[in-house]
Swiss-Prot record:
Keywords of this entry: Acetylation, ADP-ribosylation, Chromosome, DNA-binding, Glycoprotein, Hydroxylation, Isopeptide bond, Methylation, Nucleosome core, Nucleus, Phosphoprotein, Ubl conjugation
Cross-link (Glycyl lysine isopeptide (Lys-Gly) (interchain with G-Cter in ubiquitin)): 35, 121
Protein name: Histone H2B type 1-K
Post-translational modification N6-methylated lysine, affected residues: 117
Gene Ontology terms, MF aspect: DNA binding; protein heterodimerization activity; structural constituent of chromatin
Record PTM Omega-N-methylarginine, positions in chain: 87, 93
Phosphoserine: residues bearing it: 15, 37
Ranges annotated as biased composition (Low complexity): 1-12
Modification ADP-ribosyl glutamic acid, positions: 3
InterPro entries membership: Histone-fold (IPR009072), Histone_H2A/H2B/H3 (IPR007125), Histone_H2B (IPR000558), HISTONE_H2B_site (IPR055333)
The species this protein was found in: Macaca fascicularis
Residues the record lists as N6-glutaryllysine modifications: 17, 35, 44, 47, 109, 117, 121
Length: 126
């Protein structure tokens, strides 16, 4: 009776990591590229507002995307305002005006007051 065919030996558990941490020709390990995000800051705000609430990684991804989107909109609008007024520098005034233009009613008022408070705190700490 013929013996059952032997399957190929199973790959070792750590084999995939060895591929990602490949060494360069000069023997140094390749540095992983750092992915910047606002997750640390979103988490800090969440814990300040709702200390007993957590957040999933999917929700954190959505929050990160939201912050990036709002940042780009405000920066774009502030840039346009500076260009219209023939200025080469975006100041807190352009940011404030951009926020007033982009955010609706009460949300804009709160954002402006929080921004003013942050700028005051920053300048007094200098």
């Amino acid at each position: 009776m013929p013996e059952p065919a032997k399957s190929a030996p199973a790959p070792k558990k750590g084999s995939k990591k060895a591929v990602t941490k490949a060494q360069k020709k000069d023997g140094k390990k390749r540095k992983r590229s750092r992915k910047e995000s606002y997750s640390v800051y979103v988490y800090k705000v969440l814990k300040r507002v709702h200390p007993d609430t957590g957040i999933s990684s999917k929700a954190m991804g959505i929050m990160n995307s939201f912050v990036n989107d709002i940042f780009e909109r405000i920066a774009g609008e502030a840039s346009r305002l500076a260009h219209y007024n023939k200025r080469s520098t975006i100041t807190s005034r352009e940011i404030q005006t951009a926020v007033r233009l982009l955010l609706p009613g009460e949300l804009a008022k709160h954002a402006v007051s929080e921004g003013t408070k942050a700028v005051t705190k920053y300048t007094s700490a200098k």
